[in-house]
């Protein structure tokens, strides 16, 4: 008789515990019910990136001294720097600079350690293409400034969405 009573008490305790856990989960679900949705309609609405967002790298050809610090600090030795030594002035002259964004991990080491600040991170993150060879950017493609999301009048950002009346 006593084992049957203890089994019944254990069953009751387990039922109460399970009901409490289900109730806690339901309360969390209900707490999210009155919040605004986070989902955006991507091609037409975009989130504004933070100041420290690590997007596509912008390169300024005139500032580069071809020191190759960016290549040495890159964990995958990605930037390709072609230069020629000018013997009359004893300086390097930059011929070509390219980065393959299909391989780049956007760590930002090249930007951080560049002594002349010729590299900077932009807020551009739309780098998708149908051919991965198009992701190999040379100094001309790297030098183009991206259109700012805030300044683009065709795109609605979260800041300029119409107010939702409740």
Swiss-Prot record:
> What processes in GO biological process is this protein linked to?
photosynthesis, light reaction
Q: Which SUPFAM superfamilies match?
A: 4Fe-4S ferredoxins
* Gene3D superfamilies attached to this UniProt entry: 3.30.70.3270
In alphabetical order, the GO MF annotations are: 4 iron, 4 sulfur cluster binding; iron ion binding; NADH dehydrogenase (ubiquinone) activity; quinone binding
Chain positions recorded as [4Fe-4S] cluster 1 binding sites: 64, 67, 70, 114
The note on the cofactor says: Binds 2 [4Fe-4S] clusters per subunit.
What cofactor does its activity depend on? Answer: [4Fe-4S] cluster
Q: Where in the cell is it found?
A: Plastid, Chloroplast thylakoid membrane
Question: So where does [4Fe-4S] cluster 2 get bound?
Answer: 74, 104, 107, 110
* UniProt protein name: NAD(P)H-quinone oxidoreductase subunit I, chloroplastic
């Amino acid at each position: 008789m006593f084992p049957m009573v203890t089994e019944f008490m254990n069953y009751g305790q387990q039922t109460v515990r399970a009901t409490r856990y289900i109730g806690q989960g339901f309360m969390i679900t209900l707490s999210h019910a009155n919040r605004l949705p986070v989902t955006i309609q991507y091609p037409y609405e975009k989130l504004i990136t933070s100041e420290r967002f690590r997007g596509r790298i912008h390169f300024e050809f005139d500032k580069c001294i071809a020191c190759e610090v960016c290549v040495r600090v890159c964990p995958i030795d990605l930037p390709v720097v072609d230069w020629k030594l000018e013997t009359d002035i004893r300086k390097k002259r930059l011929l070509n600079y390219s980065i393959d964004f299909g391989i780049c991990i956007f760590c930002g080491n090249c930007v951080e350690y560049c002594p002349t600040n010729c590299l900077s991170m932009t807020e551009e993150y739309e780098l998708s293409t149908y051919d991965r060879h198009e992701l190999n950017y040379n100094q001309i493609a790297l030098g183009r400034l991206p259109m700012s999301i805030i300044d683009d009048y065709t795109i609605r950002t979260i800041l300029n969405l119409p107010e939702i009346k409740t």
